[in-house]
Amino acid sequence: MKPAELKRLYRIVKVQLEYGLDELLPEHHLTRAPLLARKSLFWLRNQHADKALGDRLRLALQELGPVWIKFGQMMSTRRDLFPPYIADPLAMLQDKVAPFDGLQAKQLIEEELGAPLETWFDDFDIKPLASASIAQVHTAKLKSNGRDVVLKVIRPDIRPQIDADIKLMYRVARIVAKALPEARRLKPVEVVREYEKTLLDELDLRREAANAIQLRRNFENSEELYVPEVLTDFCNETVMVSERIYGIQVSDLAGLHANGTNMKLLAERGVSVFFTQVFRDSFFHADMHPGNVFVNPNHPENPQWIGLDCGIVGTLNSEDKRYLAENFLAFFNRDYRRVAQLHVDSGWVPLDTNVDEFEVAIRMVCEPIFAKPLCEISFGHVLLNLFNTARRFNMEVQPQLVLLQKTLLYVEGLGRQLYPQLDLWQTAKPFLEKWMANQVGPQAFLHALKERAPLWFEKMPELPELLYDSLKQGRNLNQRLDNLYQGYRQSKRQQGTGKFLFGVGATLVVCSAIWISNQLEPLAIGSATIGVLCWLLSWRAYRQ
C-alpha cells in the first residue's frame, strides 16, 4: 500500500477503536490474528464510553465520511438484522448528518448560478432543511410566482474524501481476492467499482435531475408514487432546484398513525412500486432509505409514496429481468430444481455444476425458512443463506445486480417497519406472475410484433439491396475459401516433399559416415554432398 492509503487505513481503525466499536465483535468470535492486532494497538482506547454503542457507531461513520455514511444508512433499514439500539441511532444518518455552514452553501449556489440568489429567489433559509452525506438542502421561494422550492447543493471538498476511501477499498478488495478464493467468487473488485460508480453519479446533480424527470414521467398520474418536479433552468453539476413537497417522513410511524394512514396498503404499495420500477420500467430508484421517502398526508386511506433524491438509480436488461422473475417465482413455489437450473443456465454457477446436488443444497437452506409463516420470512436472511450455499458451488455474484439486491433490502426494511405482518412474497407473487404472462404466449408475441412492425416496414425497401449484397458476399466468400483450401493443399504437398528430402538427406549422411569408416572416401564425400543438398531443399520446401 502507498503511504497515503496506510495513513487512511490507520485513520479508519483509529476512529473505530476510539469509539469502542470493537465491542461489536465479541472476543470469543475472533481468531488469534485479530486479537493480537487489537492488543498491539493498546494506546487506542474508547474515548466515548459515556455514549451508547449505537450512538458511537453513528458518530464514527459520520466522522469517516460519505462512503461510510451510506453504509450506515443501509444498516438502519434492516431492523430484522440489527437490534433497535443499533438501527435507531443509524436512522439519523438518513437526513441528520452534521451540516456545513449555510452562508457557505449560499455562496456556492451563487457561484454556480452566476448571480446573487435574490435575482431569482426570495426567503432563502440559511438553516438547512436537511443535511445528508453528499449534499445539503435549503428552502426558498421563486421570485416569479412565489412557489415553494428547495435548493440542493453538493458539500464542498467532498470528492477527495470519496476518492481516498474508494482507492483504499480497491486495494483491500484486490488483496482479499488474491488471499481468499471464496471471496474471489464474489467479485470484490467489481462490487467496489459498482459502488464507486453509484457514489460518483450522486456527485453530479445533472444526472439526478435527469433521473427524477424520468421517474416522474414513469409514474405520471399514479396513485402509488409521486416524484417532485425539477426546475431545469436552475440545475447544474453541483446545484439542483426542485418543487418543495410537504409530507410525513415514512419513518415517522407516530405521525402516520395520527394521520389515519392505511399502514397495510402503504407497505404493500412500497413493494408494488419497487416491482413496477424493476419489471415494467427497467429503471428503479436505488436509494430508498427512509430519509428519501415521504408519504402524502392527503387521502390517508389511499396513501401515496413520495420519492426524493434520485441520485442513485439502477437499470436491468430483459435477460436480467426474466431471470429474476423466474427465480422469484420458483422460490415462491418452492421449485428448488428450477432455481438450481436457472443458476446454471444464467452462468451464475459453472455449467458442469451437479444440478441434483445444488438442488439439495438449496432445499436444505430454504425449507427451514419456509417452515415459518410467510409474513415472518426475511428476504435478507434468505439472501445470506443462499450466498453461503452458492459459495460451495463456485457461484459468482453479478455486480450489476448489487443495486437491485440493496434496494430490495431497503424496501423490505421499510415495509416491515410500517406493517410488521407484511407478506412480501404474497404481495409480489401476483405481480410477477402477471409480468411473466405478458412475456410469453400469444399476447406477448402480438405485443412484440406490434412493437417491431414499424421498424420492419422502414427497413423493407432496403431488403433487395441487402439480399444482393449478401449473395455477392457469399460468392466472394466461397471463392476465398476455395483459394484458402488450394493454398492449404499446396502447403501440405510442400511439407510432404520437405519431410521426404530431409529423410533422404539424413540417410545419405549416415551412409557417408559408414563409407568413411570403410575407407571409401570418394563415395562418402559424394553421399554427404548429396545429403546436405537434400537438407537445403527440404528447408526451402518448409519455408515456402
Curated annotation (Swiss-Prot):
The keyword ATP-binding applies. Its main location: membrane. ATP binds at L129, A130, S131, A132, S133, I134, A135, Q136, V137, K152. It is a multi-pass membrane protein. Keywords: ATP-binding, Cell inner membrane, Cell membrane, Kinase, Membrane, Nucleotide-binding, Transferase, Transmembrane, Transmembrane helix, Ubiquinone biosynthesis. Residues 123-501 form the Protein kinase domain. InterPro entries: ABC1_dom, Kinase-like_dom_sf, UbiB, UbiB_bact, UbiB_kinase. One of its GO terms (cellular component) is plasma membrane. The active site is at D287 (proton acceptor). Its EC number is 2.7.-.-. Pfam families: ABC1 (PF03109). GO terms for molecular function: ATP binding; protein kinase activity. HAMAP family: UbiB (MF_00414). NCBIfam families: PRK04750.1, UbiB. This is Probable protein kinase UbiB. It comes from Vibrio cholerae serotype O1 (strain ATCC 39541 / Classical Ogawa 395 / O395). The gene is ubiB.
